[in-house]
Amino acid sequence: MSERYPIIAITGSSGAGTTSVTRTFENIFRREGVKSVVIEGDSFHRYDRAEMKVKMAEAERTGNMNFSHFGEENNLFGELENLFRSYAETGTGMHRHYLHSPEEAAPFGQEPGTFTQWEPLPADTDLLFYEGLHGGVVTDSVNVAQYPNLLIGVVPVINLEWIQKLWRDKKQRGYSTEAVTDTILRRMPDYVNYICPQFSRTHVNFQRVPCVDTSNPFISREIPAPDESMVVIRFANPKGIDFQYLLSMIHDSFMSRANTIVVPGGKMELAMQLIFTPFVLRMMERRKRAAQ
């Protein structure tokens, strides 16, 4: 961890809701005048969309039915660790973008599903903000989790996570239920081995729990609304967290354990604002002292 060049990382599976958390942080950064550089985890996949289809077909022909974006084989873990290390030491590093859609690809004159060229990070940023699958990953050869000053896990209960992924991939990307289900099944070993362990390394976890029946996520026609859920917020180290303040500010919240507060689903963004604004301000104070 670096006080002069801090890193915030949001880690969560596909469909977990990390994008909405990123929007909350963008609001905090804008309000507090923090200049951040945002890194999307997709940009550290090893293969672009077309290459991934070819590699997946090759893997299936050899009997590997679990070839996925979640595992080490298909990601540039070493390059991600190098970026975090370089930024923590010098405030610099190399990054690129993954172009998901025609709208994102058009300014670069490229096809969707491709990567831009590697380029240096912008100069004079206050912090690096990562959102993706592997912000807290640790393997035999890399340790990404050691660098973030603040590591946040976004992990709905599994059925809700699947409902969110099914809805997004069907509505926004045009996939069938069968295709999304195949993806979920194919990713399961890597989900267990690479995604889940990260949530034991995070500083804070947000777990949305539905209060409606999600027993069979594959037939759900809609995502449970925020008001139909609760959010369990767990702090790895509760020292310094003003739980009484949070309880007074968030209506219908309560403590379930000494390090855990539960809030209504519709209050998740408010909870994040109340919890993380002081974190960010303290980071900026330490950064100023370290630069002197």
UniProtKB/Swiss-Prot annotation:
Binding-site residues for ATP, renumbered to this chain: G12, S13, S14, G15, A16, G17, T18, T19, S20
- Biological process (GO), any one: reductive pentose-phosphate cycle
Where does the chain cross the membrane? none
Return the EC number: 2.7.1.19
The enzyme's main class, written as a single word, is: transferase
Catalysed reaction equations from the record = D-ribulose 5-phosphate + ATP = D-ribulose 1,5-bisphosphate + ADP + H(+)
List the InterPro entries hit by this protein, alphabetically.
P-loop_NTPase, PRK, PRK/URK
* Functional pathway: Carbohydrate biosynthesis; Calvin cycle
Name the Pfam families for this protein.
PRK
GO MF, one term, reads: phosphoribulokinase activity
The record's note on quaternary structure and interaction partners says: Homooctamer.
What family is reported? Belongs to the phosphoribulokinase family.
NCBIfam families per UniProt:
PRK15453.1
Protein name, entry field? Phosphoribulokinase, chromosomal
- In its UniProt entry, the species of origin is given as Cupriavidus necator (strain ATCC 17699 / DSM 428 / KCTC 22496 / NCIMB 10442 / H16 / Stanier 337) (Ralstonia eutropha)
